[in-house]
Amino acid sequence: MANSFAARIFTTLSDLQTNMANLKVIGIVIGKTDVKGFPDRKNIGSERYTFSFTIRDSPAHFVNAASWGNEDYIKSLSDSFRVGDCVIIENPLIQRKEIEREEKFSPATPSNCKLLLSENHSTVKVCSSYEVDTKLLSLIHLPVKESHDYYSLGDIVANGHSLNGRIINVLAAVKSVGEPKYFTTSDRRKGQRCEVRLYDETESSFAMTCWDNESILLAQSWMPRETVIFASDVRINFDKFRNCMTATVISKTIITTNPDIPEANILLNFIRENKETNVLDDEIDSYFKESINLSTIVDVYTVEQLKGKALKNEGKADPSYGILYAYISTLNIDDETTKVVRNRCSSCGYIVNEASNMCTTCNKNSLDFKSVFLSFHVLIDLTDHTGTLHSCSLTGSVAEETLGCTFVLSHRARSGLKISVLSCKLADPTEASRNLSGQKHV
């Protein structure tokens, strides 16, 4: 516990029992969800709000807590603390946990109880670091699952579709953290997403997506090529658009930053040894593999403006999106076949070795031969009245629609100014003329 004084006044999480009253608990916040609103069944036309979090006071004991109330109270309470803070909760209601129903959407905990906070009776206080024993603070670096209970990124890729929809644990290093992107849904709800690229000794780049504000805030604190994370209970899916496996942070997920476990120390040494040399040469561009909402792209550019924008943003990780009215000035489909189409593994979706026609990822530890399929990889030039963009990448479904053939998504070119075509169709001359006149998006 925090200290001898704290040990006398706080109830440990291991001692919690239903219907206990007038108690105080202390713990480190190891997980937290966003505030959500739901229609109030008792008051038609109004909403009730809720959020939940998970606290821990020892290596073996942690519990979920939730609070319901009006919008102002819930948002104020949620904003008062973050993951990593130590909190004191006074007068929570102790209820028995409905394991099967609640752990479907909440983190699995060893306790049979849960805490319910009410506006009228419960309080939450954030402790300053000097008030708390370092043993309690150190719990933030201890995963909630066994240190060996995880998949390597290479294992996930190798298993492919067999892990689709599964909830698993992942230990990996942070390669990059994308900027949060905000959007509004068709029913006018605001949302956000952030993509984190992970890597380890077995895989050079793997996408993990955060959809809630709490996990995005946590991700923004990570240092690329320095931070290691243990992500407990992330959902794994095969992304048909990207043709690869991806991870998603869900409401069950608890992410431990820089976990204090031997496996993480080994990975950390790997990061340090390869930080400067960057020997991982099979990198897949993360932004090209993101799902892009074309309806949100409204800025119109000329070739000259795009080149100027590229020079201005040189060195920045985020891509730029825009509309270009141009004609295809080079479409070299008469080139060697190997430069127009590539073979991909039907299991993991990665490009296979051209000489052996075998996937080194899936077949290196298996006698089962994995089939391959053809994938477009066409480089085109786009030209307008201001200049030409050379070696633009025309791949995937866009290439299929443009060329009238049916292959699937391929990697894009890796050198020079990189342009990816997200949509390609005939432009109305009047519309093109109107948009090209007086546009300034540099």
Curated annotation (Swiss-Prot):
Summarizing the function annotation, the protein's role is: Single-stranded DNA-binding protein required for homologous recombination in meiosis I. Required for double strand breaks (DSBs) repair and crossover formation and promotion of faithful and complete synapsis. Not required for the initial loading of recombinases but required to maintain a proper number of RAD51 and DMC1 foci after the zygotene stage. May act by ensuring the stabilization of recombinases, which is required for successful homology search and meiotic recombination. Displays Single-stranded DNA 3'-5' exonuclease activity in vitro.
**What is the main EC category here?**
hydrolase
- Compartment(s) of residence: Cytoplasm; Nucleus; Chromosome
Keywords (alphabetical) are: Chromosome, Cytoplasm, Disease variant, DNA-binding, Exonuclease, Hydrolase, Meiosis, Nuclease, Nucleus, Premature ovarian failure
Query: What is the organism field in this record?
Result: Homo sapiens (Human)
Q: Which GO terms describe its biological process?
A: double-strand break repair via homologous recombination; female meiosis I; fertilization; homologous chromosome pairing at meiosis; male meiosis I; male meiotic nuclear division; resolution of meiotic recombination intermediates
Describe the disease involvement stated in the record for this chain: Spermatogenic failure 22: An infertility disorder caused by spermatogenesis defects that result in non-obstructive azoospermia. Premature ovarian failure 23: A form of premature ovarian failure, an ovarian disorder defined as the cessation of ovarian function under the age of 40 years. It is characterized by oligomenorrhea or amenorrhea, in the presence of elevated levels of serum gonadotropins and low estradiol. POF23 inheritance is autosomal recessive.
The entry sums up its family as follows:
Belongs to the MEIOB family.
Q: Kindly provide the name given to this protein in its UniProt entry.
A: Meiosis-specific with OB domain-containing protein
Which Enzyme Commission number(s) are on file for it?
3.1.-.-
